[in-house]
Amino acid sequence: MSEKRTSLWENGLIWFGAGVSIAEILTGTYLAPLGFGKGLAAIILGHLIGCLMLFFAGVIGGKVRKSAMETVKMSFGQKGSLLFAFLNVLQLVGWTAIMIYDGALAADGVLSVGRWVWCLVIGVLIVLWIVIGITNLGKVNVIAMSALFVLTLILSKVIFLDSGAVGMAADESMTFGAAVELSVAMPLSWLPLISDYTREAKEPVKATAISAVVYGVVSCWMYVIGMGAAIYTGEYDIAQIMLKSGLGIAGLLIIIFSTVTTTFLDAYSAGISSESIVRKWNGKHVAIVVTVIGTVAAMVYPMDNITDFLYLIGSVFAPMIAIQIADFFLLKRDASSQNVQLTNLIVWLIGFLVYRMLMHVDMPVGNTLPDMAITMLVCVVASKVGKER
């Protein structure tokens, strides 16, 4: 029996679902102090950088038909890749909890029955999504995405056409570089996941391009909704925006379905990454466990400001993908037969430290691009020096 492959349409739908998210709208609100013009420029520049990296990561996995964490072995070796598989599972558990928390908080603002109840509802729906499975979600996703698309159009209309409010004045509390970095961070957080989906595609390179473009456009749109809401309605609480818009139950559906379709990807990929750590584990079962942990964490811990979490993701995964790009596209080498590729691990550590240092420097293009350029340069030089020795 031939393996079922995903179409370009299905890949586009998956990444549309990833982009429509409460977390992205909330992150967009952080950019309001820049004002609309500068904020929009930062969103677009950040997403261009982030989605280009997303594309490269997806192409690597798609071409070799390997999951995201399996492709990491090509640069860091069998055991060396375990560090990133572990860090990836950790960030995905974090994202699962944050997404459920944000969704439940917003849902409770529309229909107040208690945040923990909404955490449970969203958690159960995510488990249902995992059980149905990615290749069987085609029709379910089409219905969910169509509804989300219409409802987010309504939300955009309410914010930009019906608010009637004068935009708030820009201030200096957010620099342009920091705004770019917050815009890079979202696509970058998907970077260790994209190959989990492109490896299943009939046409991996085309599917990767469509995935990166669809996600980039939708994510920009979510950021703009959040930023616009904060600027034009003076409201940072997404539930309040929806209530003021008269989007009671419809708004509730946006919140729940967008949370489920995005968080499903986090939990599913945590399961796939866990298989790289312990071969005997079943990815689907781990995904369900991750959802349960995320649901409990969302009930117990407050997770209102995620900027530090986003910067941490950037500092871990920007140098990682820089090394992968250098190895796959420039040096054309594969370390997957090795136990540990020590040189690349040292280069990654340098890249991680450089990113953390760049956080204290205000650069117009953010930290990710300079950090990746430095990491790739160090990687290529280290490779040449190693050969000469």
Mark where each language-model region is.
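Membrane-interface "cap" regions at the ends of multi-pass membrane proteins
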Residues: 1-38, 136, 175-180, 192, ...
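Transmembrane alpha-helical segments of multi-pass small-molecule transport proteins
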Residues: 14-18, 84-89, 110-132, 145-156, ...
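Extracellular loop-to-transmembrane helix junctions
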Residues: 29-58, 80-82, 215, 370, ...
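Membrane-water interface regions at transmembrane-helix termini and the short interhelical loops
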Residues: 29-33, 59, 98, 102-110, ...
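Juxtamembrane transmembrane-helix boundary signature
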Residues: 44-76, 83-89, 383-387
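Hydrophobic transmembrane alpha-helices that form the core helical bundles
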Residues: 80-113, 260-276, 319
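Membrane-interface loop-to-helix entry segments
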Residues: 117-159, 170-171, 208-215, 310-322, ...
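C-terminal membrane-solvent junction of multi-pass transporters and transport-like membrane proteins
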Residues: 171, 323-389
